[in-house]
Amino acid sequence: MNNKLSNAPIYDEKWIERLAITIFDDIAVLTKDRHGVSRETYGKGETDAINYLSKLAVKLGLYVEVDDAANVFFSSKPIVNSRYMLIGSHMDSVPLGGNFDGLAGVLAGFLILSYLSKNKINLSLPLKVIALRGEESAWYGRNYIGSKSIFGLLTKEDLNSTHRKTGEKLSKAMQSCGVHINKIQSSISLIDKENIELFIELHIEQGPILVDRNWPAAIVTGIRGNNRHHNIICKGSAGHSGTIPRYLRKDAVFAGADLITRMDDHWNTIQQHGGDLVLTSGIFHTDSDHHAMSRIPGEIFFSFESRSQDVATLDALEALLKSECKTIERERGVKFEFDDLIKSSPAELDEVIIKNLLDAGESLGFERASLPSGAGHDAAVFANVGIKTGMIFVRNDKGSHNPYEAMDIKDFMAGLSILKKFIIDY
């Protein structure tokens, strides 16, 4: 046997899996924090991870290009004035987050592209992979920054939003990463969306359903939109806890708790009537400089988020929130002050893509598993500008947005194999 041939690398599923493990491990070390990883939106961790992939792409013989929003594209060769398929996800993480949120989707596309290139497999249309910046809202209170930039959708308010700790404006952070901020400010689309045949995003499931149903992977049927208030203030009147009777109190904590309880009742009613809805108040606190065991709290600060696949449900919840606040103001003598509402629209995914992804999975021996996405994703931006879009979820134990994300590499390979077959068969 020819020694050169026998020693030649075999670019198969095992090669993909080995490379996947190496990349996941390397980026985890590169972006590690005191717990988990931190890949800050338009910050060091996100940039380091993108640079790692870009250098590896060159070694693998792939073509790398960077757009004016510092998103990075990978392809087997330059694609000019031609329709193409696009796979991708985001490279940032929440502070002290897990290693697989976002990265799994970028890496799935990256590995499929590398596999196709090494094996010289021709497709009906060229394939690009995108590593998106800034999907997480945890850093600047704004989500989908990279994907919105692509389509000229970032607003002045978005660009003026400030970092959760440093107070730095998003626009400045973007410039420091090489973004051509003038183009972003002018709301110019950075690519011709008519050239994008479809967009597919693989992502870890960030809830417990795949684990509960023992599905290694599943196809997403739709993406919930959300309404978000990052900082609502309830103002009452501080006082001595022992001297003021209930009927004279203006207790901000009790007023806030009353509001959350009422909204929970509305949530329950809507669900009983078949509506799709989840509500969360993830931030709820008094002022640490003033709170005390024996002090009636005069002020609280809290967030409020509603998510649904139905815009009418989101609008109804916002109206109910404001209405209940007015009622509680009258009953408890407090005042609610609202910040600006931030909206993300629900997204309908392409029915043909959903069916073809299910068919691809079934042909590989997987159950025809599907579910809606409760979390928002970059895929929603692509879908809502009219691009045919699909999503694949991969099983992930121990939740997400925490350091304990536990995606098994075999489950990742299951999702990747479905995506790879879909792309090859398209």
Each model region followed by its residue ranges:
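A non-catalytic alpha/beta surface segment that caps or lines the substrate-entry region
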Residues: 31-77
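Midchain, well-structured core segments that form catalytic/ion-binding scaffolds
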Residues: 135, 141-311
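Zn-dependent metallopeptidase/amidohydrolase metal-coordination segment
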Residues: 12, 23-26, 88-89, 298, ...
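Catalytic-core environment of secreted peptidases
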Residues: 56, 60, 72-104, 109, ...
